[in-house]
């Protein structure tokens, strides 16, 4: 017995010594001490576990939300996989079934559970700092549709580069020798284990395992290496190479279903190692930079995480092993210089192995999904291989070819040793199972290598062919026209039109936005060069610009339909021609370049008087193709170099972040003949690829044979017509059938549309309807729904198709910017993927967008190409947390574009109006260009809808989805319009409209001969008979109303026909249709129409949704319905603008509307009843009060004289009865008596007397100079009182001046210069004078009114009172005044003025100009009297101060004097018909309109200075006899062509100040009334309750010495009185 015991002890000692040598660990420990320590540790762990398992309600709720079906927008669980479901902790349960001892099981399980609990307690999502209670592990769910989804957290991009050092040392572990070495080592380990089994009894088995598994602090395998060189942690050894990276992302193994994880359950030894490996790096944990990540080549040592602090305490005799989280500093020298072909070869090898394994797994996969969850024994070796490879996918391809390097070999050997260390700790059963797996791997590795390993030369050749093929699909063609001379005009050059045709002789659309010019400061209207006949027959004038040879015109013809054979075949140039123009302006010698190739160098014909000269230029295809090939080769060379540098230096930072395949970067590498899926095996960087099970599910759904690479590579030629038949381009449903393999609708031999080639690196748009979420559509494979013709090269399999979709088309219409320069396309394709191609929320891209109530979900601009069951790629995750500036700007511009309601339906010509704040070829351009020529599934709608956008409102009929070729026609022609109403906005019983407006291509309202409806109106119901809401109300012109007398209402029955038929008087081209929806009230607005179809002479011209009215009278026009445009011709739109009554309506014009009907809340209890509720038309009293007219005053009996207004006499007496306000003094500056011929009669001092005579009659005055003789001294325009007459004034008494002529004279009137000493003293001037001649009163009973002096000498302020003028005023009838009980003041009026001000002097104070600090001017002005008639003005009526530029020193003879303001030549840019004056320091420029009689003005028209618009008036005020009646801003003259919306105002020739309430005048001047609402808004900025005051920059004082000289002196100025 003792001998046997001794032999066992010796054998145990020998085994212990061998293991101590193999693993460099000291295993000699006393059993009793070890057992006691284990019990203590077990108690401590149990306490910790109990504490950790107790969760508060917040943690429970977080766990429920974060581990369930919730997919958060922050990226925590956004990636989906379809791997078979496994239990997350199935390794624990499997550990319990092992035959090891109870102590070993309990210890192992507790350690693992405690470790998991500690890990969970230190997590936070989704950033680097983990949230408590959030353990970011893989989650497996099963949807209602059946497929399983594997959701796992994303890999963080920013930390990938830090692992490059590790990966360089560990990349060789993937070689074919590794399974062999590992198997040999494992056989040795198994034999050793068997010896150990033989040496010890069953009782001591678990004890010895415990002894062997307890490490010592001096473990050389751990202490001697940094973090990345440590032995593997718990979990499968195959994860060792990437475990640090996975922990960086807060995630465990790649998938809980991995066989190695389930089988290689660690012993207790792995606890500390697991702690070391799971101590998450915290470098930059608090910093999150939402921009494009840059590789950190020298990462700092990470900080210690709380996991390290929470380690359970050990007995005092034990020493804690230090945690080392320090990472090896990376050095650029570690990266070998590799060729891009080597990278591609490595990708081919991986892809081939992956495809082979996947197909084998698919063939042997168990039928029952539950069988997969039972465990590894049920899986074939191919499944094990797949799962094994899945754990190695994060190794970068850039280091896959470094097996020759000694460092790589050493790293591989070290990895094998470390794996054996881990395997040695396993039980014998586990080691035996692993050995079987490795034998199976080794036996088939050679076969896989023979099948899938191409040579470098083959890969390189394939790469060149692929690049050439991909580049055959062009983004755009660039045409340059160089004009060297014209036919003789020395100043101008012009062209009528330039047209481009493709190989099918189809005219190619060119946006005006894509036309540019160089070498001229004034480009002219470049949009006139292209698409002149697009919108209508009426063409604008030809394009002209100043000629400074050589002049270069640039055209960009975009491949909007992504045709594979997109080439330019012919260019037609139409030279300058007008019927009466100078044909010498036409271009003569020109050069034409197509993509930098000269195709034409010659003369263009000169047009004759009958027709323009057309010149067709054929494009040589050889030049174009050779240049294209050259570009492709250059791009290939540069790309290879760039790939070589990026792979070696920056950890393939620019290779699409692993989510965009190298196939994309290297011109879309296609599948080999064996069908390897290079697109799926796309991970050439340090980030994770999608799971194999997802690809398997993807291939299963698509049902496409793997030999797709053998398909013919010729691209399908798209037909030239705009709307090809359905059979030529399959719809989305047909594409889906192709992918499913159920039905093939395409002709035999035709390449499927989803495999048609398209340009590299360019976003694709989708026109399909968005699919429902996966859980709502169990029968449809949503991974393929909604895709357009793919951008894949012919021959790609579905896996590569998916990969390219993810790399290129994550959010088409919002992300990637297109490279305009073809030469830069390959390089830009690599950088745009991770910076721009991102979904802002990283949700499943096919998510449903919420309906807005007005518009349905947009299924184009916001949709993506991969389905809900496809996991989002890594760039999605990163970009979702780093929104890029470019995508944000494109979103902003997209929102701006949507706000262009009415014009956006036809964006082809209006796209250039949007501010070009993005780089050329930005995403907005691409969005618009794509949709201008593409087939859209649903008809492009009216305003607010982009062409090609389809709307997915719930109630919308999807009948047009199958057709997919409807587009709103341009200017449809016909005579009968039928509006078919499909649905309402919610009312189940009634449907109604407020009005319908139709405009023709002439800009005029269409004359309607008949209108009828079916059903006609609600009078067909039994309870009605005389309801006023009939169909004829739709065309009565009253649309913005809530009055029942002007609306139409009819019964509505779901499923039946409801239509309105309108017959035009004459057939015409329809340019605009406006639908005013039912607007009775907010509640009743749900009776408005929703989905309609319009037919014009049986041609469908519109199908879509009409916006619901607001139910109020306030708001913008789009709040009342919708406007549908059928043209974008600027001339037609401007003509419509001027005849459109909609823009006349404002709050002031709504006074004729009825009060809103008193709303009775409808009953809600009969929601399911079929009984139609009763509706009653409002019968409120009419608010309009009849306008009364005052009878005109009877004329005063006229005094009979031989000549009216001419009186003869000798003694003239003037009696002054009132002053302008002074109660003590009255005075005058000068007086003249006007003779019959208008001359001043001579008056001498002895002929004139006064009573009182002067101030000297007062006691306090004795020698005052203001005597009577000053009235006739001839000095009248003055402010010196020694030239004025002043007398004491007593109200109510007579103050008489008597003039006795030497003989009888014919007197026509008087001329006064009132008292003008100062502005304050002007109130001493005379106001009322009664005149008599020889005792006969010749003045009106109230006397003559004398104008008050101005108080300055800015103009000759003489007032000429002619007797005849007063006789005419008495004979003319007074205008009728309207008595109205309510105010008619318009809400848009920006001033409160007396109605029709009356006065003598209308003074315009010009406060500022539009920018010129030295000059200010006007072109013209007109004043209208109370009857709306223009007041004739002469030079005596107009004056200015300063007078003109002639007032400047050294300037004389300038013709821009004030009289030009009234020369009737106003709509001009000729400076000879304008007024210009200098701006002098300290002075306000003034323009005076002076009248001798009180004049009532109803309207003033102003023409701003047009010659130099910045010298025009900006801020000004209007004073009438020194009373301010208006101030505002006069718009600067603009030569731009306007539009129809308020956001793009048309060119207004003049601006109007309205004082009248006459509706006719207001209607006539509706477009020119000055409105300053925007400028009058006062905005106050606040920040944290603090008012922010932006200190305005002090305006610098203008130096008069720097004033530029200006003078126009073509004709002599006429003499003026002042």
Swiss-Prot record:
GO BP: any one term: cerebrospinal fluid circulation
Biased composition (Basic and acidic residues): 238-250, 801-812, 821-837, 858-878, 888-897, 934-945
The protein's role, per its UniProt record: May influence the stability of microtubules (MT), possibly through interaction with the MT-severing katanin complex.
The protein's assembly and partners: Interacts with microtubules. Interacts with 4 subunits of the katanin complex: KATNA1, KATNAL1, KATNB1 and KATNBL1.
Coiled coil feature spans: 613-643
Main location: cytoplasm
Subcellular location: Cytoplasm, Cytoskeleton, Cilium axoneme; Cytoplasm, Cytoskeleton, Cilium basal body; Cytoplasm, Cytoskeleton
Record PTM Phosphoserine, positions in chain: 453, 660, 691
Pfam families registered for this protein in UniProt: DUF4457
Cellular component, GO, one term: cilium
The entry's keywords: Cell projection, Ciliopathy, Coiled coil, Cytoplasm, Cytoskeleton, Joubert syndrome, Phosphoprotein
PANTHER family noted in UniProt: KATANIN-INTERACTING PROTEIN
Claim: Magnesium is one of the keywords in the record: no
Disease (UniProt): Joubert syndrome 26: A form of Joubert syndrome, a disorder presenting with cerebellar ataxia, oculomotor apraxia, hypotonia, neonatal breathing abnormalities and psychomotor delay. Neuroradiologically, it is characterized by cerebellar vermian hypoplasia/aplasia, thickened and reoriented superior cerebellar peduncles, and an abnormally large interpeduncular fossa, giving the appearance of a molar tooth on transaxial slices (molar tooth sign). Additional variable features include retinal dystrophy, renal disease, liver fibrosis, and polydactyly. JBTS26 inheritance is autosomal recessive.
Region listing for Disordered, in residue ranges: 1-21, 84-106, 119-138, 212-260, 616-691, 706-727, 743-899, 932-963, 1154-1176
Species this chain originates from: Homo sapiens (Human)
Protein name in UniProt: Katanin-interacting protein
Classification via InterPro entries: KATNIP, KATNIP_dom
């Amino acid at each position: 017995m003792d001998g046997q015991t001794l032999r066992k002890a010796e054998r145990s000692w020998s085994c212990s010594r061998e293991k101590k040598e193999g693993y460099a660990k000291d295993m000699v420990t006393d059993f009793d001490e070890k057992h006691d320590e284990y019990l203590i540790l077990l108690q401590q762990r149990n306490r910790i576990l109990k504490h950790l398992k107790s969760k508060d309600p917040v943690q429970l709720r977080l766990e429920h939300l974060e581990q369930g079906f919730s997919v958060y927008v922050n990226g925590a669980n956004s990636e989906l996989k379809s791997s078979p479901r496994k239990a997350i902790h199935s390794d624990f349960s499997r550990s319990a079934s092992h035959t090891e001892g109870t102590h070993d099981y309990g210890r192992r399980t507790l350690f693992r559970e405690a470790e998991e609990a500690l890990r969970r307690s230190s997590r936070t999502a989704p950033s680097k700092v983990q949230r408590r209670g959030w353990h970011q592990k893989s989650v497996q769910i099963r949807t209602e549709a059946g497929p399983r989804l594997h959701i796992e957290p994303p890999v963080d991009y920013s930390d990938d580069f830090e692992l490059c050092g590790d990966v360089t040392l560990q990349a060789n572990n993937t070689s074919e020798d590794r399974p062999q070495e590992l198997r040999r080592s494992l056989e040795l380990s198994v034999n050793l284990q068997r010896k150990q089994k033989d040496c010890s009894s069953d009782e001591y088995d678990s004890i010895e395992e415990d002894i062997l598994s307890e490490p010592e602090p001096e473990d050389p395998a751990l202490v001697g290496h940094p973090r990345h060189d440590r032995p593997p942690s718990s979990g499968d050894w195959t994860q060792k190479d990437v475990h640090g990276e996975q922990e960086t992302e807060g995630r465990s193994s790649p998938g809980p279903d991995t066989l190695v994880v389930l089988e290689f359950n660690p012993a207790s030894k792995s606890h500390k190692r697991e702690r070391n490996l799971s101590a998450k790096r915290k470098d930059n944990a608090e910093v999150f930079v939402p921009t494009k990540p840059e590789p950190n080549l020298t990462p700092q040592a990470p900080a210690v995480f709380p996991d390290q602090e929470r380690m359970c305490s050990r007995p005092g005799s034990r020493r804690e092993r230090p945690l080392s989280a320090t990472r090896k500093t990376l050095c650029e020298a570690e990266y070998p210089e590799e060729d891009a072909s080597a990278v591609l070869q490595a990708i081919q090898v991986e892809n081939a192995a992956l495809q082979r394994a996947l197909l084998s797994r698919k063939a042997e996969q168990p039928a029952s999904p539950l069988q997969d969850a039972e465990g590894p024994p049920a899986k074939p070796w191919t499944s094990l291989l797949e799962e094994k490879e899945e754990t190695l996918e994060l190794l970068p391809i850039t280091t896959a070819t470094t097996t020759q390097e000694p460092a790589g070999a050493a790293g591989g050997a070290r990895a094998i040793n470390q794996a054996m260390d881990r395997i040695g700790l396993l039980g014998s059963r586990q080691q035996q199972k692993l050995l079987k797996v490795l034998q199976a791997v080794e036996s088939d590795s050679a076969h896989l290598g023979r099948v899938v390993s191409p040579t470098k030369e083959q890969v390189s050749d394939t790469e060149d062919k692929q690049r050439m093929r991909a580049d055959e699909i062009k983004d755009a063609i660039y045409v340059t026209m160089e004009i060297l001379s014209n036919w003789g005009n020395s100043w101008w050059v012009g062209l009528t039109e330039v047209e481009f045709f493709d190989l099918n002789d189809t005219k190619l659309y060119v946006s005006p936005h894509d036309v540019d010019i160089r070498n001229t400061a004034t480009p002219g209207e470049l949009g006139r060069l292209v698409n002149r006949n697009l919108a209508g027959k009426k063409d604008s004038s030809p394009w002209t610009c100043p000629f400074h040879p050589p002049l270069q015109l640039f055209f960009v013809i975009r491949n909007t339909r992504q045709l594979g054979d997109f080439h330019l075949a012919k260019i037609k140039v139409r030279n300058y021609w007008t019927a009466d123009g100078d044909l010498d302006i036409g271009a003569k010698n020109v050069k034409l370049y197509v993509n930098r190739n000269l195709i034409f160098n010659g003369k263009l014909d000169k047009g004759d008087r009958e027709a323009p000269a057309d010149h067709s230029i054929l494009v040589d295809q050889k030049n174009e193709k050779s240049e294209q090939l050259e570009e492709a080769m250059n791009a290939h060379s540069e790309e290879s170099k760039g790939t070589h540098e990026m792979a070696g230096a920056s950890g393939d930072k620019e290779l699409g972040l692993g989510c965009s395949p190298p196939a994309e970067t290297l011109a879309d590498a296609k599948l080999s003949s064996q069908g390897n899926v290079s697109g799926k095996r796309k991970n050439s960087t340090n980030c994770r690829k999608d799971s194999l099970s997802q690809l398997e599910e993807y291939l299963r759904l698509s049902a496409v044979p793997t030999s797709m690479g053998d398909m013919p590579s010729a691209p399908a030629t798209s037909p030239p017509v705009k709307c090809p038949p359905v059979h030529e381009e399959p719809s989305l449903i047909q594409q889906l059938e192709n992918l499913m393999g159920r039905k093939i609708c395409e002709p035999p031999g035709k390449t499927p549309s989803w495999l048609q080639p398209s340009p590299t690196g360019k976003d694709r748009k989708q026109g399909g309807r968005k699919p429902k979420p996966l859980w709502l559509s169990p029968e449809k494979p949503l991974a393929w729904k909604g895709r357009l013709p793919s951008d894949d090269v012919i021959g790609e399999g579905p896996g590569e198709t998916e990969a390219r979709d993810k790399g290129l088309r994550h959010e088409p219409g919002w992300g990637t910017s297109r490279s305009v320069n073809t030469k830069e396309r390959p390089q830009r394709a690599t950088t745009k993927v991770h910076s721009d191609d991102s979904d802002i929320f990283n949700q499943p891209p096919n998510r449903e967008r919420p309906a807005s109530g007005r518009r349905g979900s947009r299924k184009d601009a916001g949709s993506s190409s991969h389905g809900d069951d496809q996991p989002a790629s890594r760039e999605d995750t990163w970009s979702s947390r780093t929104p890029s500036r470019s995508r944000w700007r494109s979103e902003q511009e997209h929102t701006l574009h949507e706000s262009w309601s009415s014009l956006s339906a036809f964006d082809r010509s209006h796209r250039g109006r949007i501010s070009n704040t993005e780089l050329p070829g930005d995403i907005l351009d691409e969005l618009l260009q794509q949709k201008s020529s593409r087939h859209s599934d649903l008809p492009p709608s009216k305003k607010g809808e982009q062409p090609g956008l389809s709307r997915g409102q719930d109630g919308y009929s999807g009948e047009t989805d199958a057709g997919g070729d409807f587009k709103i026609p341009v200017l449809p022609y016909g005579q009968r319009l039928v509006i078919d109403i499909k649905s309402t906005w919610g009312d189940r019983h009634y449907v109604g409209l407020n009005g319908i407006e139709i405009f023709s291509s002439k800009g005029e309202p269409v004359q309607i001969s008949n209108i009828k409806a079916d059903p006609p109106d609600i009078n067909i119901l039994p309870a009605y008979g005389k309801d006023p809401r009939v169909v004829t109300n739709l065309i009565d012109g009253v649309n913005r109303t809530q009055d029942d007398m002007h609306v139409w209402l009819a019964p509505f029955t779901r499923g039946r026909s409801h239509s309105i038929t309108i017959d035009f008087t004459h057939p015409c081209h329809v340019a605009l249709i406006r639908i005013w929806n039912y607007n009775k009230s907010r509640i009743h607005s749900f009776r408005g129409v929703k989905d309609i179809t319009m037919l014009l002479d049986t041609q469908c011209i519109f199908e879509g949704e009409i916006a619901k009215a607001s139910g109020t009278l306030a708001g913008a026009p789009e709040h009342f319905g919708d406007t549908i445009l059928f043209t974008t011709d600027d001339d037609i739109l401007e003509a419509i603008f001027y005849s459109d009554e909609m823009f006349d309506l404002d709050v002031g014009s709504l006074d004729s509307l009825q009060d809103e009907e008193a709303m009775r809340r409808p009953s809600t209890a009969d929601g399911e009843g079929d009984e139609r509720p009763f509706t009653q038309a409002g019968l409120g009293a009419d608010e309009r009060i009849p306008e009364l007219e005052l009878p005109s005053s009877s004329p005063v009996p006229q005094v009979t004289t031989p000549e009216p207004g001419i009186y003869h006499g000798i003694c003239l007496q003037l009696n002054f009865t009132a002053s302008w306000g002074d109660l003590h003094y009255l005075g005058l500056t000068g007086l003249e008596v006007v003779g019959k011929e208008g001359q001043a009669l001579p008056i001498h001092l002895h002929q004139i007397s006064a009573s009182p005579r002067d101030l000297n009659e007062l006691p306090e005055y004795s020698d005052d100079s203001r005597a009577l003789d000053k009235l006739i001294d001839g000095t009248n325009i003055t402010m010196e009182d020694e030239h004025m007459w002043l007398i004491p004034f007593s109200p109510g008494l007579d103050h008489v001046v008597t003039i006795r002529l030497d003989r009888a004279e014919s007197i026509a009137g008087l001329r006064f210069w009132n008292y003008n000493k100062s502005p304050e003293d002007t109130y001493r001037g005379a106001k009322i004078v009664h005149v008599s001649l020889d005792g006969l009163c010749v003045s009106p009973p109230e006397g003559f009114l004398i104008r008050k002096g101005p108080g300055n000498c800015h103009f000759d302020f003489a007032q000429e009172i002619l007797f005849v003028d007063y006789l005419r005023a008495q004979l003319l009838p007074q205008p009728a005044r309207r008595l109205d009980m309510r105010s008619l003041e318009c809400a848009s009026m920006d001033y409160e003025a007396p109605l029709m001000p009356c006065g003598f002097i209308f003074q315009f104070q010009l406060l500022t100009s539009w920018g010129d600090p030295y000059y200010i001017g006007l072109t013209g002005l007109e004043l209208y009297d109370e009857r709306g008639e223009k007041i004739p003005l002469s030079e005596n009526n107009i004056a200015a101060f300063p007078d003109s530029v002639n007032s400047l020193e050294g300037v004389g003879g300038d013709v821009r004097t004030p009289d030009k303001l009234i020369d009737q030549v106003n709509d001009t840019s000729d400076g000879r018909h304008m007024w210009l004056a200098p701006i002098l320091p300290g002075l306000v420029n003034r323009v005076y309109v002076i009248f001798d009689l009180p004049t009532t003005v109803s309207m003033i028209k102003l023409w701003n200075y047009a010659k130099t618009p910045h010298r025009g008036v900006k801020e000004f005020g209007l004073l009438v006899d020194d009373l301010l009646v208006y101030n505002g801003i006069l718009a600067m003259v603009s030569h731009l062509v306007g539009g129809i919306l308020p956001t793009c105002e048309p060119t207004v020739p003049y601006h109007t100040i309205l004082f009248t309430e006459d509706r006719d005048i207001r209607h006539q001047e509706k477009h020119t009334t000055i409105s300053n609402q925007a400028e009058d808004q006062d905005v106050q900025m606040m920040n944290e309750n603090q008012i922010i005051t932006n200190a305005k920059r002090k305006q610098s004082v203008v130096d008069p010495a720097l004033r530029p000289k200006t003078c126009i002196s073509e004709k002599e100025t006429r003499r003026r009185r002042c």
